[in-house]
């Protein structure tokens, strides 16, 4: 990731990938054919782009650490997601991912790291790289670990009700089936309130 030398603070939307941009499946999304964008996500992200936000993905990709897929596979899928979004007026400014898996990882990947959410090492790196304004930036994710990560870096987390969640092998998560106009407007209104503070 190229570091920005611009001294201007940027509004950023930090966003999880699997389950927030593309549909979460019970396995791992490491091939292009696994990727199905959540309906309405293109509209949501294009609205943030129009408002001058940098769109930055922060994602756990522990399947690398388990030996299920490679770094190259993650880059291929990330480029594909970016391509799909750019065809619809959106796009990703930066991808940050953690390959580690403390529980099921092998070799050098079986570590308790600070970059795997809820750790915030990657988020802090992205904040630095993009000169993010913590006060006007926000984090959107489907997993409780996303909220914990955002909290550690003093980034506002869009208030998802995690009381009615699915418990999965990858944590407590809500299922975002689509970004309806009402949900998009709610997220945009939340972001706007941050800009007024």
What are these model-predicted stretches?
Residues 16-18, 60, 142, 146:
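Acidic active-site catalytic centers that drive phospho-/nucleotidyl reactions
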Residues 41, 45-84, 90-101:
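Substrate-recognition element of Asp-dependent hydrolases with the DxDx(T/V) motif
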Residues 2-8, 72, 79-93, 103-139, ...:
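Asp-based, Mg2+/Mn2+-dependent phosphohydrolase catalytic module
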Residues 2-56:
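Active-site neighborhood of HAD-like aspartate-dependent phosphohydrolases
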Residues 21-39, 64-73, 87-90, 106-114:
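Metal-dependent phosphoesterase signature
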Residues 27, 98-101, 163:
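Short, solvent-exposed coil/turn elements at secondary-structure transition points
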């Amino acid at each position: 990731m190229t570091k920005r030398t611009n001294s201007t603070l940027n509004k950023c939307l930090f966003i999880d990938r699997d389950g927030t941009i593309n549909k979460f499946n019970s396995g791992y999304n490491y091939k292009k054919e696994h990727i199905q964008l959540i309906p309405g996500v293109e509209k949501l992200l294009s609205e943030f782009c129009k408002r001058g936000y940098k769109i930055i993905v922060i994602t756990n990709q522990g399947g690398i650490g388990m030996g299920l897929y490679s770094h190259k596979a993650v880059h291929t899928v990330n480029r594909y997601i970016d391509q799909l979004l750019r065809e619809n007026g959106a796009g990703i400014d930066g991808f940050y991912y953690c390959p580690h898996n403390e529980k099921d990882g092998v070799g050098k990947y079986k570590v308790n790291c600070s970059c795997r959410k809820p750790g915030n090492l990657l988020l802090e790196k992205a904040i630095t790289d993009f000169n993010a304004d913590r006060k006007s930036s926000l984090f959107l994710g489907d997993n409780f670990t996303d909220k914990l990560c955002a909290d550690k870096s003093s980034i506002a987390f869009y208030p998802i009700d995690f009381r009615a969640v699915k418990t999965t092998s990858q944590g407590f998560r809500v299922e975002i089936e689509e970004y309806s106009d009402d949900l998009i407007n709610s997220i945009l209104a939340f972001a706007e309130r941050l800009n007024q503070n």
